[in-house]
Amino acid sequence: MNQINYLTSERNFLPPTDRDILNLGNNSSNSNNNSSSSNNNNNNNNNNNNNNNNNNNNSNSNSNSNNNNNNNSNNNNSSSSPDHMSLHSNGMDIHHNQQNHHYQNIQHQPHHFQQNYDERRIDYGNNNNNNNTNSMNNSNNNSNNNSNNNSNNNNNNNNNNNNNNNNNNSNNNNNSNNNNFNYNIKQQPQQTLQNQIVNMNGNIITSNGNHHYPTPHMLYARMAEIVEEPLYVNAKQYNRILKRRAARAKLESENKLPKTRKAYQHESRHQHAIRRQRGCGGRFLTKADQAKLDAQNAANAAAAAANPNASSTSTTTSNITNNNNNNNNNNNTNNNNNNNNTNVNGSGGSGGSNKIASSDDDIENDVENDSDSANIKNNSNSPNQSSSSPPPSKSKVVKKSNTINKRNNNINNNNNNNNNNNNEKTQPISSSSSSSSPLLNNGHIQAQQNQSPSSSPSQNLPPLNFSNNINNNINNNGNPTNFNNNNPNNNPNNNNNNNPNNNSFLPPLSNFSNNRS
């Protein structure tokens, strides 16, 4: 929205009449009068500043060319940017020279222009001719522009008329200020409910309904009508929708709806967080897992009580010793433990189900399938095999075991194969053996292996042996210590620097127990 201040010789604001507004830009002779009046103004500047007559003459020629350009642009875009003279085409330009001569002096700069400017708004639309679009500050800078016209012209001449060629806006502003029309245009946010608004075509837009302009509240009302329109469907489509709804309701009641990707991710993330919190390398513990864990703990406690050599202050240590004794006495058990160790350290489990169970029964079924994974691999007629999880192909199993054997051979070349007892203490729970759930010691996992002599020894894999320098035992603080029974400095909490077997310089391996690779 543009704003124009109108000034007469009485220094009062005189808004244009309706006839003047309707005749915007239709008088080309008026624009010519405007150019002649601006030339007179430049002559007045020369009379006031006789010292720079030559420079002023040059600047006058430049300003005349600018005036011509300005007039041409006004004539071309008379509807979008009319000059001031066309608004006062009824002989009012008789006062302009007197007025301009009066305001050449800086002491007579009227300060009430900006304070009492006209509140009327005239909309010229998007003004293609930007020569007349100065800022509001020109009303305050009239004195500077009028008094320093010569200095501005000198600057233009010193710069080889670059300013005149490039900055037509400044010359046009000087012309308007010399005429003292105070022709200040400021872009305003468009308001459609003014009493009288002139658009770029010269049509008057009034708020009394003469011109239907799309005001915001009208648009909002139409949008509300569109939103409230009902959705019409035929009977065939409606019956199809009803059938879909009924089928979905039935699946919801039976808890058989497939989870969306987002829900699946949320539940999977939640269960992984629980596993990390419990330090469990395998799957999430269910009631069946907990029952098997309790039974295993009871058996381990009984075996530890029967064996005086396995006496220890913690339940975890007695369980580990029990496993070691079983390994020494039973080759089948040792092989099974080796298989579990290999699965933990890189085989990726033994093909446990990836689905998120929707109830405890489903989770128990998955647990049973995973606990008998060796039977599923080797014997397709296993009685414990569930029909919901088909056995993997034997070629995949052979490939997996070959990969692990390669890695085990590389490790065994650097280590002692007789380090099985130490290795038994360090392995976290297998992701494939649900019955060998962990014993927790301050949140850290201690190894227990499932003993199932029914599994085929031919598919058992060799153990992963770690370096003798690092036995990777996890003590109560989660730090690696050398757990050598013959070493007197062997306290798991002992971080004595004098102990040559102490590995306190290594980073803590508490995350090792959570390795589910």
From Swiss-Prot:
It holds the Pfam family CBFB_NFYA. It is found in: Nucleus. Keywords: Activator, DNA-binding, Nucleus, Transcription, Transcription regulation. One of its GO terms (biological process) is regulation of DNA-templated transcription. A motif (Subunit association domain (SAD)) lies at residues 232-255. Residues 262-287 bind DNA. The keyword Endoplasmic reticulum does not apply. The keyword Transcription regulation applies. PROSITE patterns: NFYA_HAP2_1, NFYA_HAP2_2. Residues 26-81, 126-183, 304-345, 377-388, 408-423, 448-517 have a biased composition (Low complexity). Residues 1-11, 438-447 have a biased composition (Polar residues). Residues 359-371 have a biased composition (Acidic residues). One of its GO terms (cellular component) is CCAAT-binding factor complex. Signal peptide: none annotated. InterPro entries: CCAAT-binding_factor_CS, NFYA. Residues 1-95, 121-183, 252-281, 304-517 are annotated as: Disordered. Its main location: nucleus. One of its GO terms (molecular function) is DNA-binding transcription factor activity, RNA polymerase II-specific. Component of the NF-Y/HAP transcription factor complex. The NF-Y complex stimulates the transcription of various genes by recognizing and binding to a CCAAT motif in promoters. Heterotrimeric transcription factor composed of three components, nfyA, nfyB and nfyC. nfyB and nfyC must interact and dimerize for nfyA association and DNA binding. Belongs to the NFYA/HAP2 subunit family. This is Nuclear transcription factor Y subunit alpha. It comes from Dictyostelium discoideum (Social amoeba). The gene is nfyA.
